Amino acid sequence: MMIMTTRTFFSWFIVICAFWLTSFSSVPVHAQLKGTISTADFNPIPIAVTDFFSNDSIGLKIAAVVAADLERSGLFLPLDKASFLEKISNPNRQPHFPYWQEIKAQGLVIGQVIRENDGRLRVDFRLWDVFGQRQLKGRRFYTATERWRRVAHMIADEIYSEMTGESGYFDTRIVFIDETGPQNARIKRLAIMDQDGANLIYISDGSELVLTPRFSPKRQEITYMAYEHNQVPHVYLQQIEMGQRELIGTFNNMTIAPRFSSDGQKVIMSLLQNDGSANLYTMDLRTRMMTRLTTTSAIDTSASYSPDGTKIVFSSDRSGKPQIYTMNADGSNLQRISSNEGSYSTPIWSPRGDYIAFTKQLEGQFSIGVMHPDGQGERILTTGFHNEGPTWAPNGRVLMFFRKNPGMGPKIYTIDITGRNERQLPTPNDASDPAWSPLLNIQ
């Protein structure tokens, strides 16, 4: 896929301020949202996403996916197309801003789709600041017809980034465990799909038990555990695009929660010892050399690297019940950072480095929360019967996790770091243990 810039009429930076999003003033729209993205008491920004002009239905489809991405973020309110007072027939012409101001749209998205002679699609879009009466963004994309959804996600990322000051996360994938069958004979398959639930593909056939899939932070590659005949643990690498699977280790004892290092060159995992303890090890993916990081009679597990690769966070019951600890990447400077009541598990470092997400069990309830890397500022985002396994969007502002309700199978949910906009992700069957990919358009 090739991308080229058309024209951007202006670019500027404004000091972050607090604005009410419901006051439809002439203040540029992206300034208004940047000031409130980290708070939980703001209203979504009204935006008009017009049907992209095309000779067939592809323009309508692209616009629909763009609008759905923006709406699902909780930061935008796509306006009903029935309210539009202007029909955009020429996307290269400046819109009549008073019409869009009348319906209180603060942002306006227009576009067109042209089929090139070689069969590719050329997709152009423009983002307008309605009250500033200026173009914020203009981009052109070329892609194969079957990849039109990716272009839609990339356009949504451009809009999200321009209007919030944060990186987008729509052009991403989710790997997870698809679950079917009765509880005493559960069939679990590795599955992957776009972040909105589209383009579902099964990676495994259900003949082996698969657990804890995790994306590389640098490539479209995953690591996961598989138990052949439910007995012998294997750790695999799988290249998503080519479908190639590589065995990186077979272990006599149980292996728990393999995860990539921040540079994608190592895998860190917990290995069960003969005395019942579990310690953390890394494996260099080039040399296959194993390095032991912890030595304890307790259970150390669920390790995750900081974005710069210098720190590791993990869960351990060395103090009596599972708590969260950090240490240097070489195993030195061990510190406990969780200090409140309850048991803590599945910690994972934000891609931005500013938060660690976790699962917390207290008084029979399971919560998803975040804290700073020093343990300060703990906040619970959602609590329920059984919430578990947070994973970060690549922009570090949205979390995904899975939830089991009484008498029901697991489902996948998203929530932002303010604790708002909790939503269930559509999956064909029960689904657990999700992991979020890096952005596809930077691969």
Curated annotation (Swiss-Prot):
Q: Superkingdom, according to UniProt?
A: Bacteria
Q: Which UniProt keywords apply?
A: Cell cycle, Cell division, Periplasm, Signal
Sorted alphabetically, which InterPro entries does this protein's record hold? 6-blade_b-propeller_TolB-like, PD40, Tol-Pal_TolB, TolB_N
Where in this protein does the record put region Disordered?
422-443
Q: Which residues does UniProt assign to the signal peptide?
A: 1-31
Instruction: Report the locations given in the UniProt record.
Output: Periplasm
GO annotations under biological process?
A: cell division; protein import
The family database entries (Pfam families) matched by this protein are listed as: PD40, TolB_N
> What is one GO cellular-component annotation here?
periplasmic space
**Role this protein plays:** Part of the Tol-Pal system, which plays a role in outer membrane invagination during cell division and is important for maintaining outer membrane integrity.
**What HAMAP family does this protein map onto?**
TolB
Assembly and oligomerization: The Tol-Pal system is composed of five core proteins: the inner membrane proteins TolA, TolQ and TolR, the periplasmic protein TolB and the outer membrane protein Pal. They form a network linking the inner and outer membranes and the peptidoglycan layer.
According to UniProt, the name of this protein is: Tol-Pal system protein TolB
* Taxonomic placement: Bacteria, Pseudomonadati, Pseudomonadota, Alphaproteobacteria, Hyphomicrobiales
